[in-house]
Design a protein with these regions (language model features):
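Outer-membrane beta-barrel proteins and related beta-barrel translocases across Gram-negative bacteria
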Residues: 1-340
Length: 340
């Protein structure tokens, strides 16, 4: 259940989320070799069973009742050209199990988590009326710069490693201090010609630098910061760079890279090209690399609109490391245009 409201004359926004459920873990009784994946990313040999790893870690498959309530207050305000929004978050989670097999020293079944932080951002722009290029399809240029910062400190009375992770958005809550510095550059132009002119984001460059306190628990080989809910972030000092270039109305290119500052390596990278051949057909090519699992994948996709309501997407994936097909996916989508 979600409840949102404004209080104190609209100066403070309140958002409450509550959930209750009966959850359990189900373990895969197969090996990485049988699933066609590399076990290195899971700390396994190719012939080790996933179920044995879970059992050795103290995880069980019994049903558990769980209740979780999250309350957030935010007070956005304008300080000159800067938008500032301090926020306060509290969360209570209860289970009908203390998970003593996973963590013998942990005897509590109710966790209290709290955090406070601030978000701030501003925007500056400049218009270049004299920019014209038939080659790059540019007609004037607006350059917008959006610097931002998000900082948060949180604590909990139960460490996230002492409870099994049924749901990463409930059990896996980060504690400690985290700061994200962001800089977004957006270049806009006019495209479409007389009578059809429209504003287009021709190039977007988004740079994020994330750093945290030394006591943050790192649970993922690829760090990630989630600005709208920092407690769900994957800890680790890193730089994330994304880029999107709309070459023309039919061709677009995207790229992403996550550089792990703790390990001094490129943890994840991706590059893609999308081509819209007609209103009915779109194709794309995407390359993805993940350092931890030594994966290098190449995916080619065809999306065809069969009718106004049906479309089909075919996505074969090639493993560049093994020089063999990894998977072939087929997705059929049915739209309901009359349903709002």
């Amino acid at each position: 259940a979600h409840v949102a409201d404004s209080i104190l004359g609209g100066r403070v926004t309140s958002h409450m989320e509550a959930r209750y459920g009966r959850v359990r873990m189900r373990f895969v009784d197969r090996t990485p070799a049988e699933l066609g994946i590399r076990g290195r990313g899971f700390g396994l040999a190719q012939d080790d069973l996933f179920s044995e790893l879970a059992s050795q870690a103290g995880l069980e498959s019994a049903w558990v009742h769980r209740a979780d309530v999250r309350q957030e207050f935010s007070a956005p305000m304008d300080l000159g050209p800067v938008r500032v929004a301090p926020f306060l978050v509290g969360r209570v989670t209860a289970w009908d199990d203390d998970f003593s097999r996973l963590s013998p020293e942990q005897t509590e079944s109710v966790r209290i988590w709290g955090g406070l932080g601030v978000r701030a951002s501003t925007r500056v722009q400049r218009v270049f009326d004299g920019v014209r290029s038939m080659l790059l399809d540019l007609d004037r240029l607006r350059w917008t710069i959006e610097p931002s910062v998000t900082a948060m400190y949180s604590e909990a009375d139960i460490d996230q490693r002492e409870v099994p992770e049924f749901d990463s958005s409930v059990e896996s809550l980060a504690t400690g201090a985290t700061v994200e510095l962001g800089l977004r550059n957006v270049f806009q132009t006019h495209r479409g010609g007389p009578g059809r002119s429209r504003s287009v984001d021709v190039l977007r460059l988004d740079t994020r630098l994330v750093t945290g306190s030394g006591d943050l628990y790192r649970e993922s080989v690829v760090p990630r910061f989630i600005g709208w809910r920092p407690e769900l972030s994957q800890a680790g000092d890193h730089v994330r760079q994304t880029a999107a270039w709309r070459v023309s109305d039919s061709v677009a290119m995207t790229a992403e890279g996550v550089y792990d500052l703790d390990e001094d390596l490129l943890a994840r990278s991706a590059f893609g090209v999308s081509v819209t051949h007609s209103p009915l057909l779109r194709t794309y090519l995407e390359y993805r690399r993940l350092d931890a699992s030594e994966n290098e994948l190449l995916e080619l996709g065809w999306q065809y609109r069969l009718s106004p309501t049906y479309s089909v997407l075919v996505r074969p994936t090639w493993d560049l490391k093994t020089d063999d097909f990894r998977a072939v996916n087929l997705t059929v989508t049915r739209r309901f245009p009359d349903v709002n």
